[in-house]
Curated annotation (Swiss-Prot):
Catalytic activity: 5-O-(1-carboxyvinyl)-3-phosphoshikimate = chorismate + phosphate
The UniProt record lists the keyword Flavoprotein: yes
Keyword Amino-acid biosynthesis: yes
Name listed for the protein in its UniProt record: Chorismate synthase
Pfam families: Chorismate_synt
MF (Gene Ontology): chorismate synthase activity; FMN binding
A biological-process GO annotation: chorismate biosynthetic process
Signal sequence extent: none
Length: 366
């Protein structure tokens, strides 16, 4: 098994490499009758595409999506939807000097150890370029969610860059689209711009923490033990390039709390059960509660930096390497729309699973 697919009923297979002619996604299991046009998916791809500001890689890709199958007269047909994005701005010559060297911090060495061959041009399949296909699939998932959970909204934003965190007291949803970092804190966005400018000019990089919230998701999604909603969300986020950690709700900080502080107390509201807090991140026992679903993931610093580092060649000789090419000083910036896309795919998948198992019937309280 090559493990290029994810999902249960809404199943996404991505394909293509960083410097190949194209990449894309084959989406199987999308319900029929979902209104979809290329422009709807393009909207989400435009938020991720490179070269939009000085804080991301200067590789210039239009990232124009083409729908090749599964859509007729502006609606999905229920058959596989094929999405393709052409690569147009590859500079493979930037990687000629490292074709026999392994870049520290990259997947070069592990791909070679596993397969005995690797595409050294931009990392091939291990490149974050692959995530464009995920965002395209996520755009389709968002449109399908509208029909099944019309109140659902999925929003991602950065909450930490290097050692610098947002001030939750200044959290403003309206600020997220107003700065290049997708930060809900205007002061943090300004401070981070100065911080990243210094790192970028020095040729270094930095990690980040991204938070993705799904609001308006109904209670009841997910299943006990091995079909947990948070299991699939954690796996989806962990599969994103450079991700080294995932948290749901309070996450690791829950270990510092007492039982009294961590348990979200329940009371009856006008529209059913309500909670005094959301330490659980909208999921209990692997099943959604109806509260906001909150997921965070941490991305490591970009490994491609302009500092000379020690490494080895394919023949085992010790040497040094300097990475050329165009790279993100903070991959967390463009990971925001990727995290949103993965959230959308998982939520839709579980909406379909829930509908298939339970239908319209649910436990009613009050």
């Amino acid at each position: 098994m090559s493990m290029n697919s994810f999902g249960h009923l809404f199943r996404v297979t991505t394909w293509g490499e960083s410097h190949g002619p194209a990449l894309g996604a084959t989406v199987d299991g999308c319900p029929p009758g979902v209104p979809i046009e290329e422009a709807m998916i393009q909207h989400w791809l435009d938020r991720r595409k490179p070269g939009q500001n000085k804080y991301t890689t200067q590789r210039r890709e239009a990232d124009e999506v083409k729908i090749l199958s599964g859509v007729f007269e502006g609606q999905t047909t229920g058959t596989p939807v094929q999405l393709m994005i052409e690569n147009t701005d590859q500079r493979s010559k930037d990687y000629g000097d490292i074709k026999d060297k392994f870049r520290p911090g990259h997947a070069d060495i592990t791909y070679f150890q596993k397969y005995g061959i690797r595409d050294y041009r931009g990392g091939g399949r291990s490149s974050a370029r692959e995530t464009a296909a995920r965002v395209a699939a996520g755009g389709l998932a968002r449109e399908a969610i509208r029909a099944l959970a019309p109140n659902a909204q999925i929003t991602g934003y950065m909450v930490q860059m290097g050692p610098h965190r947002i001030d939750r007291a200044r959290f403003d949803w309206a600020q997220i689209e107003q700065n290049p970092f997708w930060v809900p804190d205007a002061q943090a966005a300004s401070d981070w711009a100065d911080y990243l400018d210094g790192l970028r000019k020095s040729g270094s990089s930095v990690g980040a923490v991204i938070e993705v919230v799904a609001r308006g998701v109904p209670a009841g999604l997910g299943a006990p033990v091995y079909g947990k909603l948070d299991t699939d969300l954690a796996a989806a986020m962990m599969s994103i390039n450079a991700v080294k950690g995932v948290e749901i709700g309070e996450g690791m900080a829950a270990a510092e709390l007492t039982g009294e502080a961590n348990a979200d107390e329940i009371f009856m509201g006008q529209n059913g059960p309500q909670y005094s807090s959301n330490h659980a991140g909208g999921i209990l026992g692997g099943i959604s509660t109806g509260q906001d679903i909150v997921v965070r993931f941490a991305v490591k610093p970009t490994s491609s930096i302009l500092t000379t580092r020690k490494t080895i060649t394919k023949s085992g000789e010790e040497t040094e390497i300097i990475t050329k090419g165009r790279h993100d000083p903070c991959v967390g910036i463009r990971a925001v729309p990727v995290g949103e896309a993965m959230m959308a795919c998982v939520i839709l998948d579980h909406l379909l699973l829930h509908r298939g198992q339970i239908g319209a019937n649910r436990g009613h309280i009050g």
